């Protein structure tokens, strides 16, 4: 790539140019000139840094030339304007690799590509993972997320940021949090601003409804380690405040590892403030973090009897470090168990409030093979307490890797502290790659986002795409002792477009889908077999043809892939009586919902460029089928 190049841009109403640059040699610098070639500013990259975030004031409503010398700008945008929460940042394509874009592409030019979804949230470009800090604040929903502006893969973590009025259409805001400064200097260390959550607070830091709030209090993990040396890991929890929905205060530490026996994995704080019941002190807020704890800390009788705080319902899987890992390839640590560590703090939630360790609210001995939880959650819903956690480095007996598990029960007041008495447990999604779920409360609803990681190997680096996608927002409920999930009502109101016409041939009923993005709703009258061809495509890694189906055979309903690395995985939904099937297929991702959310299954799948096709054959009676265009969200 060239390390000396220039681009011309229009500043419009923006006052700040933000560039995320990597050094290519000595004397790395950015120069700004006006339309007459006169130099406006020159900024050298600090000598010690290999990466740098330039913040350069620029005049409004002029044309300027931005010149890069001995560096490459990996990510860039204009920020700071009137009504930034409505206008958003203006993306600038300064990475020479993304040469198919205009210098200042529109949202339509960025997202209207078959390699990108139309209705699911993605950043402009680069890597994205976990949803963070979900909340509603002063009339807008805030979505923060793990982000690497420097490349297509995971690296030192920043927090990206977007807002929405309706949970569907999003506005991109400036990057919110950055890695620790030393990570820009020494490439031997990695880490950054890891995942966390949000609480909306009033002017006195008391938790309150988001539309009445004065600020967002955020909690997150700071991570630091020497690359390749897990024994060097340091993780601790911090807090910071956002008062205007855009900018952030200085962070303050709030929770360190409790003792030397505590797992090095100690991250992803999720704070809840509105819980109640015998085990809850209403004057305190509660935080769960992901970790693993020594088995020796747990009473053997308590484990064998599934006492409060213990889950023993397993799924007969194995420990592995990768999605294709075979049994016995990697060795688990049987001296530890995945656990959710519980902390509490007295309200109001000042930055220096003391968080008291309450012990493990839940430990999963049924999945002890897993290394640790990630992205834990604990909340109350429909009269029950629900815990959610992703099981790291675990593959279940059906072959699914790092699934997210839910636990439903009651929070008990024990002598050791609050403990979840688990009554039922299962997977949150029967597909693959739906990970890092985070929920938040919204006027009586419990809404959740997940992140799609690429376990099916659908993503190949190429210009002008992103690597990372959020799920549709789902609303959770507890029904008959099980956690259910279904897209929020706004998804149906905003995304469903024109109805498509049905056609028939000797192979069944089919619908031609413009731009390969559609919603399908089918009501079934009986338990007979069916086959639904959701999408076809070309495998991006080897060029072979692929298919994605939903099948029912002998009472078992499952997703089936052909031509992918997941062909040997059994995506069994676990549901026997299926009467309603909903499918959201969005160019390269599918989300399936059975029986109004009784089960959900999803995965990445790269569909055909151009128009797609939905096709089905049913042995029994189909009461009705409705197929609609899935409208795009970027405008």
Model-derived segments and their meaning:
Residues 500-558:
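Secretory/extracellular carbohydrate-interaction modules
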Residues 560-580:
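Short, aromatic/His-centered strand-loop micro-motif at the edge of beta-sheets
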Residues 59-63, 578, 609-611:
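Extracellular Ig-like/FN3 beta-sandwich strand-entry sites
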Residues 15, 26-30, 528-531, 579, ...:
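Short beta-strand/loop motifs in extracellular/secreted proteins, especially
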Residues 409, 609-635:
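Ligand-recognition surfaces built from glycine- and aromatic
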Residues 2-268, 272-368, 382-430, 452-501, ...:
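Beta-rich carbohydrate-recognition and catalytic domains
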Residues 378, 520-522, 577-594:
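Short tryptophan-centered beta-strand motifs in secreted/extracellular beta-sheet-rich domains
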Residues 10-13, 511-516, 571-577:
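Extracellular/lumenal carbohydrate-interaction signature centered on repeated Trp-anchored short motifs
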């Amino acid at each position: 790539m060239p390390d000396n190049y220039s681009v011309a841009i229009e500043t419009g109403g923006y006052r700040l140019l933000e560039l995320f640059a990597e050094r290519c040699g000595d004397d790395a610098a950015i120069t700004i000139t006006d339309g007459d070639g006169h130099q406006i500013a020159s900024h050298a990259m600090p000598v010690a840094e290999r990466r740098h975030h330039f913040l350069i004031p620029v005049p409004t409503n002029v044309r300027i030339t931005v010149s890069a010398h001995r560096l490459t700008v990996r990510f860039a945008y204009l920020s700071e304007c009137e009504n930034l929460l409505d206008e958003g940042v203006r993306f600038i394509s300064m990475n020479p690799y993304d040469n198919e874009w205009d210098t200042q592409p529109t949202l339509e030019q960025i997202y209207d590509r078959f390699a990108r979804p139309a209705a699911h949230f993605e950043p402009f470009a680069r890597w994205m993972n976990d949803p963070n800090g979900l909340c509603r604040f002063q009339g807008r929903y805030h979505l923060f997320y793990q982000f690497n502006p420097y490349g297509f893969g995971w690296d030192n973590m920043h927090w990206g940021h977007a807002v929405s009025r309706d949970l569907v259409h999003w506005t991109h805001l400036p990057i919110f949090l950055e890695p620790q400064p030393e990570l820009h200097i020494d490439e031997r260390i990695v880490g950054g601003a890891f995942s966390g959550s949000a609480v909306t607070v009033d002017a006195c830091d008391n938790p309150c409804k988001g539309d009445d709030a004065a600020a967002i209090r955020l909690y997150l993990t700071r991570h630091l380690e020497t690359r390749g040396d897990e024994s060097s890991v340091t993780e601790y929890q911090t807090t910071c405040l956002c008062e205007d929905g855009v900018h952030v205060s200085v962070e303050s530490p709030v929770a360190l590892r409790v003792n030397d026996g505590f797992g090095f994995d100690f991250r992803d704080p999720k704070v809840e403030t509105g819980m109640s019941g015998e085990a809850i002190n209403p004057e305190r807020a509660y935080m769960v973090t992901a970790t693993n704890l020594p088995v020796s800390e747990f009473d053997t009788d308590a484990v064998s009897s599934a006492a409060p705080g213990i889950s023993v319902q397993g799924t007969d899987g194995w420990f592995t470090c990768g999605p294709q890992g075979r049994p016995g390839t990697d060795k688990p640590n049987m001296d530890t168990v995945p656990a959710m560590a519980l902390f509490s703090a007295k309200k109001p939630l000042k930055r220096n409030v003391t968080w008291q360790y309450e012990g493990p609210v839940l430990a999963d001995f049924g999945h002890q093979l897993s290394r640790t939880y990630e992205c834990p959650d604990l909340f109350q819903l429909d009269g029950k307490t629900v815990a959610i956690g992703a099981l790291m480095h675990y593959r279940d007996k059906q072959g699914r890797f790092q699934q997210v598990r839910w636990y439903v029960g009651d929070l008990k007041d024990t002598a050791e502290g609050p403990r979840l008495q688990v009554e039922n447990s299962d997977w949150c999604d029967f597909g693959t790659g739906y990970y890092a779920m985070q929920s938040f409360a919204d006027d009586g609803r419990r809404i959740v986002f997940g992140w799609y990681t690429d376990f099916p190997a659908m993503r190949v680096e190429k210009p002008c795409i992103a690597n990372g996608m959020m799920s549709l927002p789902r609303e959770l409920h507890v029904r008959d002792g099980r956690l259910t999930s279904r897209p929020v009502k706004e998804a149906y109101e905003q995304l469903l477009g024109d109805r498509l016409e049905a056609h028939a041939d000797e192979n069944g009923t089919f619908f031609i889908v413009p731009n390969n993005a559609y919603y399908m709703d089918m009501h079934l009258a009986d338990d007979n077999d069916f086959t639904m061809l959701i999408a076809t495509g070309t495998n991006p890694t080897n060029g072979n043809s692929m298919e994605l189906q939903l099948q029912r055979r002998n009472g078992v309903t499952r997703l089936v892939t052909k031509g992918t690395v997941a062909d040997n995985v059994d995506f069994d939904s676990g549901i026997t009586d299926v009467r309603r099937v909903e499918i959201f297929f969005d160019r390269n991702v599918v989300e399936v919902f059975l029986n109004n959310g009784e089960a959900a299954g999803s995965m990445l799948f790269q569909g055909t460029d151009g128009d797609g096709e939905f096709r089905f054959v049913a042995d029994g009676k189909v009461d009705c089928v409705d197929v609609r265009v899935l409208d795009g969200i970027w405008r």
